[in-house]
């Protein structure tokens, strides 16, 4: 992952659902019934006079933002008065694995690090980090020291972040799901009276209509792999995106398969080939292919649709608005009616350094942050009038502030986001967020192997070669250098390279994971 891509991913994660307040959300008893996690205290009250002054240092993945000093001054002024605490940020602008290496190095050197942003994409499992002494066991501390925030999670949420029965991460409260959607220009849907899109066949009808009616517009773009595009539609859960490992939602044995060995693999490749053959993709000289979706592409209006994930349209429309574009906007249409995998709340959560003496104070800070809209707004959006401007039913950056440095892209936000407090950034967004949340509730769930991270150390050479081969195969498909004989050769080559041995090792670990859970 290069640094440009980190910026794009950061913007997507931060902006993805930047809206919504408690007013339109149905709050429910999230932890009803007997449960070992339920705190006995009623409401958590902070008495700053009885607290020793404490400074906390948080590590985040992202670039340094010039406004961080101003935001910290404002936050710490209120935080110190109410909890006798001050916080500091350390932002590391690197790939996740190097970010983790830096954290480990700083902890070993004795530098202040009380907590850090955790990613499921780290090259080591949470269990390994715990065994190596980098993360604290929060099973009891979470409900005891942040009871108000803890009560905002359902039991399914809490169960989904357990590792061998223990909690090591304080999750954010923003529900995400890898739900594949066609994200289309809604003005063109209405202009040409195109029927609602409910599946890939409907989407292809849309593409054909755009090609015929508006030949100056490129019908579609996607920046994904075959497994990323189609696993959902055929009832598969993706275990490893880069390696193309999947299993069926309805398989009680949770049998792991290589994507190319599924019965739908060739159909998926042929479908992508048809998009190229039918003229739906970008033409560059004599080549036809795809491109990474960027701001210039979104604002040019030259593409009528993209295949992405539910929630991407919030980011796309926010970009249009910052550029003053109101002639069109993007709307998502789900491409299947089945379930999609809900992303673990551990993603972008907060892990506490096991060597820190301030674990309870970190949790106290989180409970303070999540206790009121006022505290949340100050940390997430800064000072009103200086870092954001209040409109009728939304907020936006002040004039002249670029998206890269606005509250959209502050790296310290992601681990603490809460759907009950998020502010809308465009008019009418609250209603769209309510629809998003409803889809997440009804059409996504935690998969059977949620939280499982395979250890590939015993099959590392097979893994490395497969990762390259899978990427090369996907590239050959989207540039049109593909036929069924090439798929047959790829399947054979992967078997010869030992993919069955890799799958068997991952299956062994997955079976043990399920038994332990």
Question: Which functions belong to the PLM regions below?
Answer:
Residues 2-517:
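Extracytoplasmic/secretory soluble proteins
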């Amino acid at each position: 992952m290069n640094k440009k891509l980190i910026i794009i991913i950061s913007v997507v994660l931060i902006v993805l659902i930047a809206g919504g307040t408690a007013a339109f959300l149905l709050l429910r008893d999230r932890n009803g019934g007997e449960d070992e996690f339920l705190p006995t205290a009623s409401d958590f009250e902070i008495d700053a006079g009885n607290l020793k002054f404490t400074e906390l240092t948080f590590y985040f993945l992202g670039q340094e933002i010039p406004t961080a000093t101003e935001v910290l001054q404002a936050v710490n002024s209120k935080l110190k008065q109410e909890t006798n605490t001050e916080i500091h940020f350390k932002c590391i602008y690197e790939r996740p694995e190097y970010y983790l290496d830096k954290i480990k190095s700083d902890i070993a050197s004795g530098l202040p690090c009380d907590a850090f942003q955790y990613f499921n994409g780290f090259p080591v499992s949470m269990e390994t980090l715990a065994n190596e002494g980098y993360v604290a066991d929060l099973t009891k501390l979470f409900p005891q020291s942040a009871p108000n925030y803890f009560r905002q999670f359902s039991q399914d949420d809490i169960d989904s972040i357990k590792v061998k029965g223990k909690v090591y991460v304080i999750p954010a409260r923003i529900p995400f799901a890898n739900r594949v959607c066609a994200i289309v220009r809604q003005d063109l849907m209405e202009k040409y009276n195109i029927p609602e899109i409910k599946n890939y066949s409907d989407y292809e009808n849309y593409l054909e209509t755009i090609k015929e009616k508006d030949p100056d517009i490129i019908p579609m773009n996607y920046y994904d792999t075959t497994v990323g595009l189609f696993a959902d539609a055929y009832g598969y859960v993706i275990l490893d995106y880069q390696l193309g490992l999947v299993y069926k939602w309805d398989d009680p044995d949770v049998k792991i398969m290589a994507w190319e060995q599924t019965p739908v693999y060739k159909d998926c490749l042929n479908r992508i080939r048809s998009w190229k053959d039918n003229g739906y993709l970008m033409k560059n000289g004599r080549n036809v292919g795809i491109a990474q979706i960027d701001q210039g592409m979104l604002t040019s209006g030259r593409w009528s649709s993209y295949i992405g994930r539910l929630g991407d349209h919030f980011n796309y429309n926010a970009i249009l608005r910052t550029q003053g574009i109101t002639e069109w906007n993007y709307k998502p249409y789900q491409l299947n009616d089945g379930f999609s995998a809900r992303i673990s709340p551990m993603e972008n959560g907060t892990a506490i350094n096991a060597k820190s003496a301030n674990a309870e104070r970190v949790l106290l800070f989180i409970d303070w942050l999540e206790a009121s809209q006022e505290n949340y707004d100050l940390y997430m959006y800064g000072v009103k009038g200086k870092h954001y401007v209040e409109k009728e039913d939304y907020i936006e950056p002040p004039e002249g502030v670029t998206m890269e440095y606005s509250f959209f892209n502050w790296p310290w936000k992601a681990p603490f986001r809460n759907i009950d407090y998020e502010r809308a950034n465009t008019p009418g967004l609250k209603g769209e967020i309510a629809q998003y949340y409803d889809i997440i509730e009804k059409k996504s769930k935690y998969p059977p192997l949620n939280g499982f991270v395979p250890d590939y150390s015993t099959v590392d050479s097979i893994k490395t070669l497969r990762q390259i081969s899978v990427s090369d195969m996907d590239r050959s498909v989207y540039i049109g250098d593909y036929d069924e004989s090439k798929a047959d050769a790829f399947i054979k080559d992967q078997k010869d390279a030992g993919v069955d041995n890799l799958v068997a090792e991952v299956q062994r670990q997955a079976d043990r994971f399920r038994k332990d859970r």
